[in-house]
Amino acid sequence: MKIGLLREGKYPPDKRVPFSPKQCESIISHFESVEICVQPSEIRCFKDSEYKEVGVAVLDDLSDCDIIMGVKEVPVSMLLENKVFYFFSHTIKQQPYNRNLLKIIIAKNIQLVDYETIIDEKGKRLIGFGRYAGIVGCYNSFLTFGKKTKIYNLTYAHLLDSMDALCKELEEVQLPNDLKIILTGCGRVSNGAKEVLDMLHIKEITKEEFISNNFYEPVYVQLNTLDYNKRIDGAISSKTDFYKSPNKYKSSLKDYINQAHILIAGHFYAEGSPYILTNDDLLSRSCKIQVIGDISCDIAGPIVSTIRPSTISEPIYGYNPMTSLEDDYTKKNIIAVMAVDNLPCSLPKDASVDFGDVFIKEILPDLINRGPIMSNASITLNGFLTDRFKYLSEYIN
């Protein structure tokens, strides 16, 4: 089996890669049947020379590879007929901007495996960059709080060269003793954010304590879906019921918002779910929110202040709940919003290594042995949508 690592072609350029040079070396040494080559790239976080040093061929032509792996969507001009491609296609939610990409993939008889579709027997996703989205997003939230309050001043994440440097930078954080933080979600993203909260030695408390008690040290609460979504009719709720009938629910986040200074949103938002945070919530006299770090970054979605994505180099903008418009985040009654939609790109080396480690451990053995995980992950096969993704037929037509 020959694996080719693509040069990222989408703009703006992405520095990440599925495997680092050391990981390629490890794969080749542990799996005799696997060969790896890599396309040359001037933007990749690892240099071409680093791959050459460990015996990986650097080639422009990947036409003799069995599997071609990238990170972001592959430009149509880089798609090779009758090949197997792995990348984040952003098509399974029927994103209109990638409809043509999927149509061409089918026309070229490409077998497409999207990393998002790789799941275990229980339906749980096995791989993604969510952990580093959470880590960088939480760091950026504290960077935003420092710039909003002028208590401290952190270096922008993309100017740091590693996770170690980010951890070192966190030593500069100085927080008020009465600070309360909400973290939504319980998946990879939110647990990545939790790593940063724990690095800062911020105390985790219960939901009841968060609402009812005063503290003399910074504290946070981690909320799952049913903590901030309740049945409209007051009936007992369950996750199964919520995902089946989200229209029967309403947000109860206001119970927590009136106690919080920072909201870090790391939840997954399903279409049809209730809005989590509204203008009315933010305009309440009881509202203390100063910073919203929306790691999930659903534009015009559940968090009313997320009116556009921000960028890695300019991660902060202000939101005025009185006008529903962008404003100067340094003003007193303006909420500082962090809503970067490509957070892992700030630490591309660490994010790539973390991704590769998971792929090697959880997925590669199944791929080599042609196991059930990978056979279930294909979106397209032999010029058609697979049974699992037949629902995309109307989307592409």
Where are these regions (language model features)?
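ADP-ribose/adenylate-binding Rossmann-like module
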Residues: 81-116, 262-323
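An N-terminal-biased, well-structured beta-alpha scaffold segment characteristic
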Residues: 2-104
